[in-house]
Amino acid sequence: MESLKILIPTDFSVQAEFAYLMVKKLEERTPVDVHFLHVLNVPDTVTMDSKGEIQTCGEIDVKYVVQQKDIAERKLENLKLLYGQNIHTHFLLGKVTDAILNFAEKNHYDLIVMGTKGSWGIREKLSGSETQMIARKSRIPVLSLMCDRSDLNIQNILLVHDFTHPAKEDLQLIQKLVKVYNTKFHLLQITSGKVEAEKFRVEENMKKFAALNNLENYACHIINDKDVENGVIHFNQMNNMDIICIGTHGKGGIFHNSATEKLINHLFKPIISFHLN
């Protein structure tokens, strides 16, 4: 079976450890190729050449940057001692979000996994806002989680979507999880109108979506709520999903980015955000 190439951005916090524990959970069913990346947040005027030498225009002390680089590289080496020599570690300079996104796309990762402290994150850590920005901009699926889910038993995966215009989406990662865990796939649409009035139309669209995306073991759900975030939270309270998947495109409408970002910050469930076509 082909391995999943996974990137874990790390600030060496316990949240980054949660991300690794989640990846180890995935490894129980599918091979994984794990890469840790630490980005030292510095202006674009600070650069590092292929030999690791630091250059700067002068507004930042080179010695300070070198010192921080040495500390980070020691911590990355400690990750290998802790998790094994089969993991890969990387160090970059730059703006955290842009560096992570560029590195992930350049190296063709299948998944980015990030631990987050939600909206209460400490500024220097990979806070909820950092994870939000990466989920918003990334064309690679992002799995985010707020706590240790190493005990997770993956049986039910929820896909929250607007099924008004059924289309083929890039669900390769989600379909792989469904296959290796033999899970049930739940399709959910949240409406602000009357459920009974829309139920037949929505379920027909869900069936078309399932056919277009080769989904088999699935169930259809439609609920009424004031917005996507509350709808997902209330549905999960009633049905206890194990992983929640939600698409992003930033074009407005019911599935604009804010719904995903609010869920990343407030829902104590692993969330996979993926880019809609």
Task: Identify what each model region corresponds to.
Residues 25-28, 81, 105-106, 136, ...:
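Solvent-exposed polar/charged
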Residues 38, 91-93, 146, 189, ...:
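Residue-level recognition of beta-strand->loop/alpha-helix junctions
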Residues 96-146:
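Hydrophobic alpha-helical segments and helix pairs
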Residues 1-2, 41, 78-112, 213-244, ...:
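Structural beta-alpha unit
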Residues 115-133, 246-267, 276-277:
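Glycine-rich, Arg-bearing micro-motifs that act as flexible, cationic patches
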Residues 24, 77, 132, 175, ...:
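Active-site phosphate/pyrophosphate- and oxyanion-stabilizing loops and adjacent acidic/basic residues
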Residues 1-57, 156-219, 241, 266:
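Small/aliphatic-rich secondary-structure junction motif
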Residues 55-71:
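A short acidic, glycine-rich active-site loop
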